[in-house]
Every structure is written in structure tokens, then in C-alpha cells.
From Swiss-Prot:
GO cellular component, one term: virus tail, fiber
Family: In the N-terminal section; belongs to the Webervirus depolymerase family.
Keywords tagged on the record: Degradation of host capsule during virus entry, Degradation of host cell envelope components during virus entry, Host-virus interaction, Viral attachment to host adhesion receptor, Viral attachment to host cell, Viral tail fiber protein, Viral tail protein, Virion, Virus entry into host cell
UniProt subunit comment: Homotrimer.
Protein known as: Depolymerase, capsule K2-specific
Main location: virion
Biological process annotations from GO: adhesion receptor-mediated virion attachment to host cell; symbiont entry into host cell via disruption of host cell envelope; symbiont entry into host cell via disruption of host cell glycocalyx
Listed Basic and acidic residues bias regions: 145-155
Chain spans, region Disordered: 137-169
Subcellular location: Virion
Organism (species): Klebsiella phage RAD2 (Bacteriophage RAD2)
Amino acid sequence: MALYREGKAAMAADGTVTGTGTKWQSSLSLIRPGATIMFLSSPIQMAVVNKVVSDTEIKAITTSGAVVASTDYAILLSDSLTVDGLAQDVAETLRHYQSQETVIADAVEFFKSFDFDSLQNLANQIKADSESAESSAAAAAASESKAKTSEDNAKSSENAAKNSEVAAETTRDQIQQIIDNAGDQSTLVVLAQPDGFDSIGRVSSFAALRNLKPKKSGQHVLLTSYYDGWAAENKMPTGGGEFISSIGTATDDGGYIAAGPGYYWTRVVNNNSFTAEDFGCKTTATPPPNFNVLPAELFDNTAMMQAAFNLAISKSFKLNLSTGTYYFESSDTLRITGPIHIEGRPGTVFYHNPSNKANPKTDAFMNISGCSAGRISSINCFSNSYLGKGINFDRSVGDNRKLVLEHVYVDTFRWGFYVGEPECINQIEFHSCRAQSNYFQGIFIESFKEGQEYGHSAPVHFFNTICNGNGPTSFALGATYKTTKNEYIKVMDSVNDVGCQAYFQGLSNVQYIGGQLSGHGSPRNTSLATITQCNSFIIYGTDLEDINGFTTDGTAITADNIDAIESNYLKDISGAAIVVSSCPGFKIDSPHIFKIKTLSTIKLMNNTYNYEIGGFTPDEALKYNVWDANGLATNRISGVIHPRLVNSRLGINSVAFDNMSNKLDVSSLIHNETSQIVGLTPSTGSNVPHTRKMWSNGAMYSSTDLNNGFRLNYLSNHNEPLTPMHLYNEFSVSEFGGSVTESNALDEIKYIFIQTTYANSGDGRFIIQALDASGSVLSSNWYSPQSFNSTFPISGFVRFDVPTGAKKIRYGFVNSANYTGSLRSHFMSGFAYNKRFFLKIYAVYNDLGRYGQFEPPYSVAIDRFRVGDNTTQMPSIPASSATDVAGVNEVINSLLASLKANGFMSS
């Protein structure tokens, strides 16, 4: 009895049967009214086919009105057992194969010579002969005296009838056996194969297939599943399929070729696509709950997956991975040595136990080399012990070119994506990838070695790729590694940082677009990214956040030879924002800065020049900033700096310069009148005891360069808890624009410090007044630079105590005694909550006087004015009145009158 059971079927109460994946009207289905359909539900339901409406609909007769959900089923093709049904089935089969022009050597010849009319006539003749034989026998018995010839004839007729009946039964049995041998197919489709009836069969496992010896080449066999009984246990792909025999020898690869002595079977690969299960790989439904604990029984997929990789490379087939966890614990590394296409699913997990590797700390889980094209997508790679490299790229075979990694996650390794060999990568793209919670770097790419030119690396692009992680809480740096001061984007001549989330060295044309670089507050991260010795490096639109390094000053990006950093989102960073070293002509454009607790917004080091900064809007963010002046004492600027600020509210005073006060070219300091100067921070020297200080606009200018053609620039320090201080230069004010104001609304400022250096001649006066809210003077004093130290060998300090109730502090300097030196390091400072605050007066010459009054909110307007070469135009300041408040006020009023009389102030 033959069966039809392709697809699934459901039945409604009215007897309508709906199929899924069925072809009920196919010429080979042999389904006709009267056939019985059995639903393999619980309980089993049965109905009788009334009409075949379409390939997916049958009208059936049912007496119970049962409703059956979609399930497995079987249609009993019992009509084939009758002579009429058999003839009709065979006729339909022959018409189908004739229309398909299929050659069926033995079967077609048999059916061509088979005369069904003769078969029917023969059956009728058998019946007539049998009846005639019985009559003849009765007549013979009644009249034995009849002629012997009649008896012989009757006996011959009886024998002929029996022979004809046996022949008919034999023919019917042969054809029915053909139908039954079709098995699950429930049709005679298998007869379309050239080997016809004698080569159709099944084998239960790949191991059994190796032992199945074919009669000849070209035979077909169906493999039920890779492992015996696997198909019944697993609803996932089970490695079954169709194989074709060959007589000869071939290498058994465990999935595509099954070889025996003198023969082998080759898998039929449809649509150039196969699965890892075709090579015997196994998955579990979910990963273990704790990635530090391995399950008691672990199936190692390393050898089988490597064989699948090799086939995908050699035949250009696509390798499909299943949902679930593939375990790997072999000492071998998975290797990709050519173009490959691997496609996983959202739930595909590679779980790696590196403990069996020879060097578990450094050996790679997967190695890619010589991949000239390809795509790897949707794989989640995990290590159970923060060891080894997740995916390593090298050039042991050749350069990697135009490889796309998409939705590839590499987590909890020592390094995530790792490139440690020069010139091994070309045109690699990372799309929506992730390197998370890795022990050292999530992304480590080094294509440059000391003493070599740049490698031949072509563009490496990162699109919406996340690189972040917490790492083990017990992380500690080894003695062989070097840590650096954590800074936001740091560029250095030579650096060997660890703990950063991404490391790039010696690359050209790199783009990191979108995505995220984040440390998630891990105490082990020195920076989010280190970029060194790179050419044309762009970071655009990337979320940079949550860095909290070994100290309070985390580093977001450390960069060298960076080309552009654009439209980045900077959040919750503790440390310097951007540090640049040895990077001529780099570009920073339009990052989004949010709550970055930075030591300095931009820090320039080591031969950095001709840079451009544009589009910054850090107004809200900068109030969280803390500036640090320490820097790295060994680094010096060796090139002339030519910054260019383009429509940016972040200016040069947000830039920290390390030990380079003589290297700044002020002629191109500001190029845009709308630029804003924010937080200029110099490094400290050994003789400067205070770590946080501000430079005024005059800090970088000679007397002739003070205004420098710009109109309005700002300097801000949001060093909490102080209210913001702004230093700005207004070029075209109608009266003396020099007002220097420091708010003391909360009585926070307790002291004013004044400092001088050495090698000055002549004398001058610093004037300090403490004013109340109405402007009345509460206390005044002046100080001679010479009085700090008569020989000027070192710098010195004088303190002015701010009285209670002072709301404003007014500063000024008067050249009183032919002062011809430069006050290169004179500071005036507000001192609040033990946080020092410095304003530096710089490049004051004998023909220059300055006067300023502090007004809220910490705004300083410093305008240059010249009183001429005759110093007598400056009022003299008698020493006897140095501590006399009335005398000081008298001199100040005289100074103001002199300035107004000479046209330097309006009335």
C-alpha cells in the first residue's frame, strides 16, 4: 500500500482539508476520490477524499465533524491494488515522465511492451477458460467413454487458465513492489533517476553511508540524518540529504564526501548552500547560565566546523549556522584562509573554552588570513575565561581584502578583534559589530611597526559598531605594560597603552562611523580608544561614554596622526577630552559633548600643527570640566602651531599645551571672529606649585599682538563650585574696555595671590581693591614686583586677604618706575575651597598700563592701550602710600583721569 504524506494538513469541521507544502494535484500524487486521509493527531482522525480542489485543498467526507490543526498526515493510495487502479496509476506515471522527456531505461521499455488491453482480455479469457474447464471436467466425469482427445483438451485448458492467472498476479505484484519502494515520496518520482528501480534507498547515518558500497557510479541514496536517530530527536537541521555514488577514491571530509574502499559518496548541495550540521556540528538550545562554568558534557565542534569552513572556501558555498550554542574546546584554532560566506542567525553562539590551547592568553579562537572577499554575519563569540584573541587577522596566507563582518559579536576574550601584523588588512568593514567586556582591548589593530613605513592597509571602516565592556573586577596591569594619564583623545609619538577599548596603529583611511566606544565605568580602562601612527583617520557620529580609568581622569580616545573626529557624542568622561600629538593637519568637527568631566577639552602635544576645530557647542557640558595642567613633562611641542577655529564656540583656551610656551605662533591664533576661547591650560613646571590656572588673552601676545584683529573671544572655566569665569577681549569699546571682574557672591574668594618671575628691571605696581556689592572699597593694596624678591632669582608670591563682604575684586597694573621688563609670570588668583584660580598678566611693557575691574560673572575685558614712550605720563606711586587705602584710591583716580585725558578712556 502506497502513502502520500508530503507537507502538513489541517481539516475544518465541514471537511475542508488545507495543506501546507503539499502538491495534491500533481500528476504523480495519484490521489483520487475515494482515497482515505488519516491525520496523525491525538486521537487519530480519518476522512474520505471526495474531491481534489487544488494542490493545497481537498474536500473530504467526515462523519464526526472533527477539527484538526495542522499536523502530519497520510493519504492511503489503496486503489492502486486493483487492476483498473494499477493501470491508471501506471498510465499517469508514464504520461508524466514522457512529458518530462525522462529516460527510464528498464521501466520505460517494460511499460512500452506491456499491453493492458491484452491483460484484461487475458483475465477474461482465464475466467472463461476456467468455467469451460469445469464444464469439461464434469462432462468427462459423466461420460468417461467420450473421446480421450476431449479429456486431454480439457486438462490443457485448465493448466492454461492457471498459468495465466499466476502470470497476472506476478505482474501485479512486481508493479506494486515498485510503488511500495517509493517509500515516503508516495509517488513514482524516484523512477525518474537513470538507475531506475534498483538504486533507490535510505541510510540512517553518515557513518553508515561510508560503509554503503554502490553497484555503480551515479546511484542515489538518501541520508536520513548525520547521526543515527538524530532526525527524530532534533527539529533543527540534522545533516541529512541526497548523495550520489562514484567509483574511485576521494578524501573523506566528514560532511561533503563520505568515502569507502574504492568508492565514495558526494553530497548534493542545493543553491550553493549547506549547514554546519551537514558536517556533524551540534548545538544546544541555550548557553550555560554562567560563562565561567562549563557544562559537564561538552561536545567539541572544532574539527567539524573547520571542515565546514574549508568546504565553504574551496567550493564558494555559503555556510549556514543554526540558532543555538556551538561549543569549542580544542587546542586548535578555527582558521579562515580564503574568501568565505558565513551566515548565522540572531541566536547563533560560538562558546569557547581556551584552557586547552598551548598559549591560552594569546592564542586566537578564530584566525582570518588571505580572505580576499567574503561576509561573516550574525555570530556571537564568547570566551569563558577572558583569555585569548576572539577573531585574529594576520597575513600568513595573504592580505585580507573587502571582508565584511556584520552583527559579529566578540565578547569576554582578552582581546576582541585583533590585528597584530603589519599590512595584513585591506578594505575590511565592520557593520553593527560589538566587542564587549574584553580583558584588554575590544578592538586592537596594529598595522605599523617601528622603523617601517606605513603598511599597505586600505580603508578599514566601522559602522555602528559598539566597543565597550566591564571586564573582570580584579583586573590589574602587568609590569610589562605602560599606563598613561587618561585623556579623552590622546595622540602620541609612541605609546603602548592597555586597557583602552580600541587600539589602532599604523592604519590609513580608517573610518569609525556611528556606534559606540564605552567603558561602562570599568576601573580598568585607561582610554576608550588609542590611535597612533595613523593616516587619515576619521571618527564620525560615535557615542563615546563612560570612561573611569585608574585615576579620576579617564581617557576617551588616545590618537596619533588622526585625520578627523566629527559629530561624536561624548558623555560621562572623566579625563582630558582630546589630546593630540604628532598630528599635522588633523581635523575635529562637531562632536556632541555631554557631561564630560575632563582635565582639558583639547590637549596639543608633540609636533601638532595646522589643525582645524569647528562646530563645537560645549556650553552646558563644560561646566562639569576640570582642567589639569600637569600633562607629561617629557613631551614638548616641536612644531609651530597654526590652529584654525571655524564657527566654533570652543577655542584655543580650551587647549592644553605641554611645555611649549615659546612655540605658539600667535599670528594665526584666531581666524574667526565668532570663535570662543575656553579654558586655556598650560602645563606646570617644577617651579609652579599650583596645578590649576588660567591664562588670559594676553598670555600669548606681545604688546603689538594683543588685539590681533579679532573682535570677541571668550575664555570659560566652569571649575565648580565657582561660578563660570569668562575672559574676553572686546576690540572696539567706546571707553576703557579693561574691566576685570571676579564675583564673590558666596564669599568664596578668600585670598588673592600675585606672582612674579625673575630678571625684571625698573618698578611697577599691582593694584588690588576689594569692593562690596555697591562698589564701595573695603580694602586696597598695591605691590611692587621688586618687593617679592630683590634679586629676582626665582618667582615669589604675595597674598592679599579678601575681607568679608567683598563681592568684587578689582585688579590693575601701573608702570611707575621705568619698568622695562616683562611680567611673564604674574598671576592674580581667586582662592575658593582650596581650589586655586589664576589669571595671568603677560607681556606688560614700560609703555603699557592695564587696569581692570571684576564684574559678575567672572567676566574679564582686557583692552590694550598705549600711553606713549614718556613714562612720566603715568602717575608716580609713592612708596609711603603702599598700604594706605586712601593713597591707593587717590593714585587710582589719578590714573583714570590721566587715561581719560590722553584719550584712552571716554568720560
